[in-house]
Amino acid sequence: MTIRNQRFSLLKQPISSTLNQHLVDYPTPSNLSYWWGFGPLAGTMILSVLSSPALVSGLMVARAKNLVHSVLFPIPIFFSINQLFHYFCRLPIIKHLATKCQLLLFLISHFLLLLVLTKLVLDLGGYLFMDDLSRALSQFVPGFSGGLGGGSNTPPNPSGDFFLSSYQTSDPDYHDQRRGDSYFSSAPGVQETHRHASGSSTNLHLNLNDQSQDPIFLEVERLSLKCDKVKEKTILKTQSLLLERGYHIPDERDIERAINVVMTEHETIDIDRRRKRFYYLYSCLGKTGNKFWMELLETLADYNINIKSDSDN
């Protein structure tokens, strides 16, 4: 009889007879693999993986991984599926059930047991992993160990700010600053020293005047000075044009006030374009019909700076 005819004859048989023929009293890896249609080697490999918690070993660190293999992995070796299923079928409630129901309940119970064991391993491995992590970080951040193994400092802040709380509890300068005895009450330019757990010290330059050496700050300051100079030239040229055209100027300071009012919106633009805008406004002075010049004349009129009339002469 060929293999094809053998499989066809098996399909015509009832399921109960097939189970009795291939599973006999207990499900062994070879029988289950034959029943499911896998080869003996493939079925054995699948059942070996499913019947042990080694699936989760790849998600743990080396410490938890060794624990999984050394404690849980030998269970299917010393207590084979045959013995487990044999004892399971002897239970008062299970022994009165059919073979198919016993097999189904056994697989479900076995799966739930593996889940419980995996949960215990994950909890224990997570604790060991966090312990190692806290010890490693305590070498760089003082007080981070928080009372765990390898540390003798106070526990961390329960709010979750571990790095901030560890610095506050270990650095005495922090408490001096809170009392106003250190940087917050001292003059600018004081250098505070922060000592790490390794004993080395790092000078923290708290001089607020150091920003004056920043290239960007220097460039902004240089452009601001140029804008101020252009604005001064605008005031002088406006005064000169008004005098040439016969305007009456009660107070020369009103010219500066009027120009400040008119140029307010132009002073709010970016510093890189402000200087070019000021030069443009400077070139608009005295041009009849120019928007900026006409607005400046209207503002000057509010300060009683007008052309002299014949009665004034």
Curated annotation (Swiss-Prot):
It is a multi-pass membrane protein. A stretch of 270 kb of the mitochondrial genome is duplicated within the centromere of chromosome 2 resulting in the duplication of the gene. The expression of this duplicated gene (At2g07718) is demonstrated. This is Uncharacterized mitochondrial cytochrome b-like protein AtMg00590. One of its GO terms (biological process) is respiratory electron transport chain. It comes from the Eukaryota. Keywords: Membrane, Mitochondrion, Transmembrane, Transmembrane helix. It is found in: Mitochondrion membrane. The lineage of its organism: Eukaryota, Viridiplantae, Streptophyta, Embryophyta, Tracheophyta. Belongs to the cytochrome b family. GO terms for cellular component: mitochondrial membrane. Its main location: mitochondrion. SUPFAM superfamilies: Transmembrane di-heme cytochromes. The chain crosses the membrane at residues 41-61, 68-88, 102-122.
